[in-house]
Every structure is written in structure tokens, then in C-alpha cells.
């Protein structure tokens, strides 16, 4: 009891010390811990357009491999927190084939994954080129390799999980909604299915996206091939998607880079064009890639902080590399083995009705 009383007295005297010091003009250093103000983090999402397994692309890859395809934008792909591409071919099995009825080798998406692509958009008009059996095999092969995809589903249960696809990226919950205007080959009424550009079917998908995610990214496969500007149907659909909760819209299918506009705070990239193909038309060789930056801060809702489009150019074998390569248009001319192709790229850029960079920083 005596020891307890002594401790109480000691504590009391310590409490009186600051008061005594103040009376004598003595300052006692007292530091109070202050929580640092939360700093915003940025989640970077990188998207490219259509990856096509044209016959000559596959022939070239058989001779030279895939390594040159995205060699010049590897830093963009791997530097992003999430990279997305439109895989516009099914894995329908042998014999492999290019346009007009695609069936690509399994090694192609394996390479795309190795180079850094994290999510594959399968909701496009070529995914049923080998019919429902080809789509079933595509899903099976993607699952077997652990590759994330959206836009299609093998069953009703899978459809709920994959459409939308919810991805956690550095704490950001991102919903990816992918669908197509139609398919070149018909589909059976049973599973597997492709997500269609149908408002009644998309309403529950968008509702799940709003409920489960912080940000809703919509990737529609739409529009008219080779048209450099969007049409009324695309614009009307974009406005409907925004009303349904879309924060960003990045489209594909036209095989050319289309115009872009801001609808309020929502950027709408109507088409990024191709990412890799054997198409010869000059507008189709000009490609787009988008980098999106989402600011995240503890206690605040994540929001779009930056959106930037850069131009790429699809080079054929012998122009820059032995095989195909998507290269930034800013790449110096010294990289070209074929100077005429560099001049062609510059002329195409000058004649394009698209502004090279759309940015919101």
C-alpha cells in the first residue's frame, strides 16, 4: 500500500511540473503527433485496340517469334497497373486461319500475357468465327492459362462473374464492361454466349458494375469499319452508358482511330483502331493507345485524373524489325530500315483529321 501511495505521489508531482515551469517562464517541449495528410495515389490503366491474327502475321511469328510485336511499347504496357487489349480472334484450334474466319494459336495470347497484358476483351464480331464450339474452346483455353477475359461467358453463373469483370488494382475496384454490336457467325440460343449491344441485356450488367466498383470502364465493339468519325448510334449509346454509370468509354471495331469527345467528365474514345494487324490501308495502320490515370485518396471516391491518347504505327516486316511491330509515331526516323515507310507515316499523320493527343491532366 505504501508503494502504491508513493507511485501516486510521484505521478502527481510530474503532472505539476509543467505548471511550475510555466510559472517560472520555463518552456517544456511538448510534441503532439499529427497524422500526415493522405496523399493521392494514381492507378494507371493502359488500353490498345484490336489485336488480329491475320495469316501473314502468324506466318511471320512462326519465323521470327512474337517478341517484336509490342517491343516498342513494352514500357507503357508493363509500367501500367493494368493493361487491356481487344483479342479479336478465337482460339478455335487447328487449322489456324486468318481473315475472314479467324482461329489463332494459343501461343499468341500467351505472348500477350507475357508482354504484360492483364485483361483480354473477347466481346467482338470475330469471337464466334469458329462457332459456339470455337467459343467454348476459347474460354477453356483462356481458363487453362489463367488469362482474365470479359465479354463472353460459358454459363449463367460465369456470366454474373465475368460481365462485368471486377478487377482490384491497388485498392481501386474497376468494373470492365465489354460487348459487341454483333458477330460474323451466328450463335446458338444456349451457352456459351457473347455480350451484345442490347440495352435490356446491358442494364443488369451496368447495375452490377455500379454496385461493385469504384470506376466503370466500358469497352464497346461498335461503329462502322474504316469510318474516321463516329456515327449517331455510337453517340446515342455512349450517352446511355454514361447515364448507366460509365466513367470512361473506350471503343473498338472500326480498325481506324476515330474522333474523341468529352461528355461532361467522361472521355469517349470511339475507336482506338488496330493494335496489331496486316491491314494495308493507311488509316488502318495508324493506331491509338490510351493511358488513364485514376486518383485514389483514403476517404475519398476515386476519380479520373488524366486521360491521354498516343498514336502508334503498325510496321510490316522489314520496315523497322524483321517482323511486325507497333511503334510510337514519335520514334526517331533512324529506327526505320525503310525510310519511305517513315515518310508514309508522317504524311498519314498530317492528313488525318484526328488530333494526335487528347489530354486531361
For each predicted feature, which ranges?
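Bacterial N-terminal signal peptides that target proteins for export
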Residues: 1-9
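Intrinsically disordered, low-complexity segments enriched in glycine/proline and serine/threonine
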Residues: 5, 19-20, 84
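Bacterial N-terminal signal peptides
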Residues: 10-20
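Acidic, metal/ion-coordinating pockets
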Residues: 24-361
Amino acid at each position: 500500500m505504501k508503494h502504491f501511495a508513493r507511485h501516486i505521489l510521484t505521478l502527481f508531482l510530474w503532472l505539476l511540473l509543467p505548471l511550475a515551469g510555466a510559472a517560472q517562464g520555463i518552456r517544456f517541449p511538448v510534441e503532439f503527433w499529427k497524422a500526415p495528410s493522405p496523399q493521392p495515389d494514381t492507378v494507371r490503366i493502359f488500353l490498345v485496340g484490336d489485336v488480329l491474327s491475320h495469316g501473314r502475321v502468324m506466318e511471320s511469328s512462326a519465323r521470327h517469334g512474337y517478341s517484336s510485336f509490342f517491343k516498342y511499347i513494352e514500357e507503357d504496357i508493363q509500367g501500367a497497373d493494368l493493361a487491356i487489349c481487344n483479342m479479336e480472334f478465337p482460339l478455335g484450334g487447328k487449322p489456324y486461319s486468318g481473315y475472314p474466319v479467324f482461329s489463332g494459336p494459343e501461343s499468341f495470347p500467351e505472348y500477350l500475357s507475357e508482354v504484360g497484358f492483364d485483361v483480354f476483351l473477347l466481346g467482338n464480331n470475330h469471337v464466334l468465327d469458329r462457332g459456339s464450339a470455337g467459343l467454348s474452346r476459347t474460354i477453356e483455353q483462356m481458363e487453362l492459362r489463367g488469362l482474365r477475359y470479359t465479354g463472353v461467358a460459358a454459363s449463367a453463373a460465369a456470366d454474373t462473374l465475368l460481365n462485368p469483370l471486377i478487377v482490384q488494382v491497388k485498392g481501386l475496384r474497376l468494373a470492365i464492361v465489354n460487348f459487341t454490336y454483333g458477330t460474323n457467325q451466328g450463335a446458338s440460343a444456349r451457352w456459351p454466349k457473347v455480350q451484345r449491344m442490347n440495352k435490356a441485356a446491358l442494364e443488369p450488367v451496368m447495375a452490377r458494375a455500379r454496385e461493385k466498383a469504384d470506376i466503370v470502364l466500358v469497352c464497346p465493339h461498335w461503329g462502322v469499319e474504316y469510318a474516321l468519325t463516329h456515327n449517331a448510334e455510337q453517340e446515342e449509346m455512349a450517352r446511355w452508358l454514361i447515364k448507366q454509370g460509365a466513367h470512361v468509354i473506350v471503343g473498338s471495331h472500326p480498325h481506324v482511330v476515330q474522333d474523341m469527345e468529352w461528355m461532361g467528365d467522361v472521355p469517349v474514345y470511339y475507336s482506338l483502331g488496330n493494335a496489331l494487324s496486316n491491314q494495308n490501308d493507311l488509316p488502318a495502320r495508324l493506331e491509338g493507345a490510351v493511358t488513364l490515370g485514376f486518383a485514389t485518396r483514403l476517404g475519398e471516391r476515386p476519380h479520373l485524373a488524366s486521360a491521354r491518347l498516343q498514336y502508334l504505327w503498325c510496321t510490316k516486316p522489314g520496315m523497322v524489325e524483321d517482323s511486325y511491330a507497333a511503334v510510337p509515331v514519335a520514334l526517331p526516323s533512324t529506327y526505320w530500315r525503310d525510310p519511305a515507310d517513315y515518310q508514309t507515316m508522317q504524311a498519314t499523320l498530317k492528313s488525318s483529321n484526328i488530333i494526335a493527343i487528347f489530354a486531361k491532366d
